[in-house]
Swiss-Prot record:
Cofactor(s), by name: pyridoxal 5'-phosphate
Gene responsible for this protein: gcvP
Species per Swiss-Prot/TrEMBL record: Salmonella arizonae (strain ATCC BAA-731 / CDC346-86 / RSK2980)
GO terms, molecular function: glycine binding; glycine dehydrogenase (decarboxylating) activity; pyridoxal phosphate binding
Subunit-level organization: The glycine cleavage system is composed of four proteins: P, T, L and H.
SUPFAM superfamilies: PLP-dependent transferases
Protein name: Glycine dehydrogenase (decarboxylating)
GO biological process, one term: glycine decarboxylation via glycine cleavage system
Reaction(s) catalysed by this chain's protein: N(6)-[(R)-lipoyl]-L-lysyl-[glycine-cleavage complex H protein] + glycine + H(+) = N(6)-[(R)-S(8)-aminomethyldihydrolipoyl]-L-lysyl-[glycine-cleavage complex H protein] + CO2
Amino acid sequence: MTQTLSQLENSGAFIERHIGPDAGQQQEMLNAVSAESLNALIGQIVPKDIQLANPPQVGEAATEYAALAELKAIVGRNKRFTSYIGMGYTAVQLPPVILRNMLENPGWYTAYTPYQPEVSQGRLEALLNFQQVTLDLTGLDMASASLLDEATAAAEAMAMAKRVSKLKNANRFFVASDVHPQTLDVVRTRAKTFGFDVIVDDAAKALDHQNVFGVLLQQVGSTGEIHDYSALISKLKARKVIVSVAADFMALVLLTAPGKQGADIVFGSAQRFGVPMGYGGPHAAFFAAIDEFKRSMPGRIIGVSKDAAGNAALRMAMQTREQHIRREKANSNICTSQVLLANIASLYAVYHGPVGLKRIAQRIHRLTDILAAGLQQKGLKLRHAHYFDTLCVEVADKAAVLARAEAAEINLRSDIHNAVGITLDETTTRDNVLQLFTILLGDDHGLNIETLDKDVALDSRSIQQSMLRDDAVLTHPVFNRYHSETEMMRYMHSLERKDLALNQAMIPLGSCTMKLNAAAEMIPITWPEFAELHPFCPPEQAEGYQQMISQLSDWLVKLTGYDAVCMQPNSGAQGEYAGLLAIRHYHESRNEGHRDICLIPASAHGTNPASAHMAGMQVVVVACDKNGNIDLADLRAKAELHANNLSCIMVTYPSTHGVYEETIRDVCDIVHQFGGQVYLDGANMNAQVGITSPGFIGADVSHLNLHKTFCIPHGGGGPGMGPIGVKAHLAPFVPGHSVVQIEGMLTRQGAVSAAPFGSASILPISWMYIRMMGAEGLKQASQVAILNANYIASRLKDAYPILYTGRDGRVAHECILDIRPLKEETGISELDIAKRLIDYGFHAPTMSFPVAGTLMVEPTESEGKAELDRFINAMLAIRAEIERVKAGEWPLEDNPLVNAPHTQNELAAEWNHSYSREVAVFPAGVANKYWPTVKRLDDVYGDRNLFCSCVPMSEYQ
């Protein structure tokens, strides 16, 4: 025997599963790029002065089975109490058909944001359904396709109210005192950076305050009271005040739509439509507004347009509002939202339909009525007469009640003076209600559910007559058709087949890191020990979560070279915002709050300037030189010019041009010299892990896209996680939380997300990835990502010029193909190439970012040589097709590129093109053919004829 037992045990087996090319294929690619070894290649590409001598010590790799067992033991420390805490979070019943066929299905969770609508019609339809649910329940005209959570949606509502307000001199925002505390927390954080004054008072006093541009009300208050705000809203609107209302999807099934009462903006959490609490997330927020404000709305909006054949097709509408185009002038910095969770909520509505949803809502309310009746019968006082699912119960001996609840493994809301809060949900049973009677009244309460049920059924007044919904909702056929599991399963599969995800092909999107989301990483997110915890449960019930988060934080600290990590931001854009706030608060602590200039290279991600604007900073653009690098002379000149007011620089590394800039430490030194801080955008961290680190380079703070580098799937546009790493001097200034004390974080700052640890239930994905890869595996992943990019660049450079390279003609983990010379010469554009790739079975690379007229390709380490070669061969074949256009063999107005993509319907129809059917639809052969269901979208038509709700079923046929 030549192998040792340790070798046979092969603890690093997962590394070989995660990294696409095996050792032999890696050597073939190294030969193709004229490099002797991976280490030699990295030595040629990464500046010597920033290379780590040794990879960060995050432990050795574990097998999938060992890592799962280890995590199972950790999560076993969590205590699964029944939580009636409420405050915007409730237990749910996720239908198994949705769990199995969507949440656990890579055809859904590995797709990207639907920028390429032709390969995204399935999830676009599901998102359109989500918008329809929102429109029906809120009674408004326009809805978005989800925001990050309810609290950030409230902050977005405030910002939007100011944008659309006609009261230009007003600078005060009124918040009703019974909104959820975490909502108020996030609103206050956002208001401070915008310079708004937040007034918190009883809603009835909203009219007493002057210079108010917007008011935030909550239809069902945090402690349960249903409010009829119709008269107040009418008076506020007479004063031209913008009215936002926080609402609850399940309550809205029974309650009057806020839009019908005059609200301008309505938002809330869609969590209770089938999405587990997950210790705080991820959850989709819904957001709706009146038609007049549609172009000021934040987030993605799905609209109905037409394709080149005149058929109805879906797309993301009005993208000119968004950060990737408008930069610092964008309505919001929102990029990743919560598509996967919004689609769960929309499918929950489809599966239950209006009748099923009403039955669920009525059952919740009936059990709440029964609980209320029994408590009142025994002499307890309810603080509110009108309620849906939440009771505020006054108790004489609160400590004793809470002790009995704890003994019964039940959580009640405990932060209300002389009272406890109890929120029921769709999982609540009559036995649960009897148990609550015992806790509040003692064992001998003598109450009978059947008797109480008869009483409240005859005379329930807990929802005032004026607040009962009197209109039909979810009348569209899609919500009234798929109620058997067979029909639902087939409907979801029909949507999935329309889309292109990683389970079918490589997605070579530059700056997006579409790597493997391994099955072993995904398994823990559905474990009930992770899924069922309330984010505000006592910390001793979440010791497993705390241990997992602590370990993950420690690993990220070591991988980034920082001193602390804050897990709260629930997207990369939120991470940017949180990091910039830390910088801002740091300057304020030194009596330098005037420092508000943020330097941003011209090549930056659109979120950077949008986030800087949100953080109350002024953006100054730094030029790039002819090689795409930061122009040091321009940087120094602008840093010196703004020395007294310089706050920071936001820089991405490797750069968005796909190059390791040799002068990155000089950049850091210049900014530090003039009193600024260095924010290093973590979007390209997949080219750093194990090789270098932001802290080692000299940065002060970064966000990490766990949904890129650390394997959380993109979910078709979310969820994401954007924790920030900081140096020690910034650690006191990371986000805190008003409800939960974050252990180990000595911060007094406000929150940026609703939950203290953001989307905590997807953190196990990144924990599993790091645990299974270990230090050496993580470094190897970065190395192979760089090798794969250089292999593609080397193979394609003669057909498509590589726009930017570093020394020795190398690129980092992505490369930019310059299509501009081809377009000028032949008339074929980067858009034509992107759409033609669909016929070859590929999602397009990133178009026209960071340079217009280009395609940016990032293969990641997970793609094997065979798939890389398939992509390369497709690009070379397309280049040959362009030559045929150039030669006049195919006219510019009728060729397979400008007509791409081609559908089955087109194949079966009369053929009048200058090229054959075979060339159109089978350019790469017939094996594993992906069929788009629509032709190229008409973007102009879609924005000029905005239609953002469900279309007739005939359009789906």
